[in-house]
Amino acid sequence: MDYKQTLLMPKTAFPMRGNLPNKEPERQKKWEETNQYAKTLERTKGRPLFVLHDGPPYANGDIHIGHALNKVLKDFIVRYKSMTGYHAPYIPGWDTHGLPIETALTKKKKIKRKEMDIAAFRKLCEEYALGQINNQREQFKQLGVRGDWDNPYITLTKDYEASQIKVFGDMARKGYIYKGLKPVYWSPSSESALAEAEIEYQDKRSPSIYVAFEVKGGQALLSGGEKFIIWTTTPWTLPANLGISLHADLTYIVVQVGEEKYIIAEALFDDVSESLGWENPQVLQSFKGKEAEGIEAQHPFYDRTSLVMLGEHVTTDAGTGCVHTAPGHGEDDFYVSRSYGIDAFCPVDEKGVFTQEAPGFEGLFYDEANKIITEKLDASGALLKLEFITHSYPHDWRTKKPTIFRATSQWFASIKDFRVDILEEIKQVNWYPHWGETRLYNMVRDREDWCISRQRAWGVPIPVFYGEDGTPIITDETINHVSELFREHGSNIWFEKEAKELLPEGFTSEHSPNGNFAKETDIMDVWFDSGSSHEGVLLNRQNHQRPANVYLEGSDQYRGWFNSSLSTSVAVTGKAPYKAVISHGFVLDGNGRKMSKSLGNVIVPSKVQKQLGSDILRLWVSSVDYQADVRISDDILKQTSESYRKIRNTFRFLLANLADFNPNTDRVKEENMEEVDRYMVHRLQNVLAEAHKNYNQYEFAPVFQQIHHFCSVDLSSFYLDFAKDILYIEAKDHPRRRSIQTGYYEVLTSLVKLIAPIIPHTAEEVWEYIPEPEAESVHLTDIPEARDVAINEQTVDKWNHFMKIRDDVLKALEEARSEKVIGKSLEAKISIAAKDEGTKKVLDEMEHLHQYFIVSEAVIVDTLTDAKEGNVVNVQVEVHPGETCDRCWVSSETVGENKNHPSLCSRCADVVTKHYAD
């Protein structure tokens, strides 16, 4: 007889290799064809609502690895919530206005914007943005991200723009919107104002100069001829200098150096003296800053004076304590000058070029003027020192070019008027990680008013009209009318119609007695676009609510979307738009470096999908501490693939050993299951409990680690291993075999549901092979909660202790193998002596020890002399004296007892005789 035919070997069509790059697209197509997203919503209808609100990526270019990290993290949460008692819709969004799209058209597509009608150019921008959305949508779907991809929210749609106008109007009605002249971040490369959120800092090489301003009219304090020393890294702002700021309470000194007398802050005497190389400087006089208020000094190259003013912004951190003040080029400069009745003066145009107001420098780009201005200072004797420094300097985050401060007339949101409310709301939000609260709190506490106007074409128009006297007109009537116009026609109508045609019929204003009106030509900051999504999406879309349960974005969004959304929401509703905020770090290469084409270290999501599969990328996301910066490389993905193989092979083994198991007819009642099976089901409950806790705290790495550890240690190394001797060898319906299969079935169905949010393609594939599944898709089921198992605490403790015994035994077997005492563990007979009473009690209560240790015989003895010493037992390993059974490979002294089956042990002979007699 061929005894192989009598073994119940594992059988499954579930493939060992995932072949994910080929299979995932097919599965995604099936999900789309069966409309699984709609089925998920239908199944969970009536449950509590859970809304993760998508921060909209910018609709330009292919998605990068940071996008993949972001969208996959969101998908973990939404999928998990829909499998744990919630109704969790997911509406993806896109941010579509702004300079990058204008640039893409003018540079890449060679469109000449200034030769076109604005409305026509805007239509090209819209077409481009929608094309980019279609491209990114497919790339996100390829990651396995589930959502309402056919109905995303897009910031250029009519309904969205209409709701944004409402937000603007609500803020204006409360007095939070105003127009004012003051210095703002200005990007000459974009020819537009920028908000703080659009600034990034990069190193820049700049001239560092010390300049002398000679006193003219020192009042009673100074005799005349003394020189204030200022320090600056922006010589190009000196043509706009109108003053010198001192701190009222600082002590200033007059220092004699050769024939010259210089004025600096006393606290900076040593630093300045060293920097300027002074020899034998003598302090002649000291006075408080407030005593010098009103003194005038001669401008170093123009025939005008600069006023000495007092400002709180003056410090002794660097410089001289005498601060060059150009009210058109600095915020502190602007405010301190205004308090002295000095208006902003800005002789630089929108391109960063000097105007006629800066004689001698007209037509020069500001940065090019540094050299000429420095030479002019040197020629006049006002330049005391020139050197070059590299420092962190604000750049336009889109063009990567330096920005300047430039005083212009702009529209602002008056953050100061509701700052206290924002700060209070920040405290009500749950922050992951916790430091996010402090980070945003400090940003809001320190930020100035928000410049919301941009001098560009592609964006939502600022819905303001001007009367004949120049007064801005914003009323509920005009706002509601414009909002409805945008809802019906889109915002392009603003550029297609005259002001009169955009106003309500019969509209009149005291500011336009003749009925003539003009319209604003600036557009809104794109952060106002996305920052209004709480109104356009959370309030207005079905199955949504404001506040959302969670916002999740990169840590750069504390200054961006988290901030703008919070500002507009608190302004309009008094409340934060979110209950919780989660931030993730940036994706770096394997060495912790930023990715760049020049370094050749860029990991592209689509390439990973084609080479390894999206589930590998998703498993990597689940394995990292995403709240800090994370690393990815080919080697790291290779390690992730190994982890994936371990999990996949565990599922395959479980499926293969359930081929002849029907849960409806073969399941063993829990109280009748073998103790070891109940213990393993209990261990499963621990995994479920911990995983639920971590999922709910948005901690995914521990979930991955728990599942991987359970598969590797609890299952592969123990439960799946020892059970082969029962599953393959015993009769099909043997109680112990069915008990193990009952345990396997619960482990399999629970684990595949638990990991489904992380690797949805693989989980679905496993589900298709599970006998008698409860639903058509694993994603249309609920993850089980941890439950009580029919096993008492003492029994659990016993098995926990047994695992320590097993560790000692396995170590002894391994040593015996390396010493060539045995080959395979089934050749062994082991003797075990407990080192304490507790261990002895556990051993005495155990049955089937030889199977749990995968040896041919295990004997418990009181003492051992020649043994391997372990932590809780001593173990002696020797070759078993019996013969090896041809069927089960166990060495037994009963081999040969059955004359019909002389090569079998008594157990196998009995099984074959009873069940395979024919």
UniProtKB/Swiss-Prot annotation:
HAMAP family from the UniProt entry: Ile_tRNA_synth_type1
Keywords: Aminoacyl-tRNA synthetase, ATP-binding, Cytoplasm, Ligase, Metal-binding, Nucleotide-binding, Protein biosynthesis, Zinc
Binding-site list for Zn(2+): 885, 888, 905, 908
Protein name: Isoleucine--tRNA ligase 1
Motif 'KMSKS' region boundaries: 594-598
Superkingdom of origin organism: Bacteria
GO molecular function annotations of the record: aminoacyl-tRNA deacylase activity; ATP binding; isoleucine-tRNA ligase activity; tRNA binding; zinc ion binding
Residues that bind L-isoleucyl-5'-AMP: 553
Predominant place of localization: cytoplasm
PROSITE patterns: AA_TRNA_LIGASE_I (PS00178)
Function per UniProt: Catalyzes the attachment of isoleucine to tRNA(Ile). As IleRS can inadvertently accommodate and process structurally similar amino acids such as valine, to avoid such errors it has two additional distinct tRNA(Ile)-dependent editing activities. One activity is designated as 'pretransfer' editing and involves the hydrolysis of activated Val-AMP. The other activity is designated 'posttransfer' editing and involves deacylation of mischarged Val-tRNA(Ile).
Comment block on domains: IleRS has two distinct active sites: one for aminoacylation and one for editing. The misactivated valine is translocated from the active site to the editing site, which sterically excludes the correctly activated isoleucine. The single editing site contains two valyl binding pockets, one specific for each substrate (Val-AMP or Val-tRNA(Ile)).
Gene Ontology annotations of biological process type: isoleucyl-tRNA aminoacylation
Cofactor(s) the protein requires to work: Zn(2+)
Keyword Ligase: yes
Top-level EC class as recorded in UniProt: ligase
Protein family membership: Belongs to the class-I aminoacyl-tRNA synthetase family. IleS type 1 subfamily.
UniProt xrefs under CDD domains: Anticodon_Ia_Ile_BEm, IleRS_core
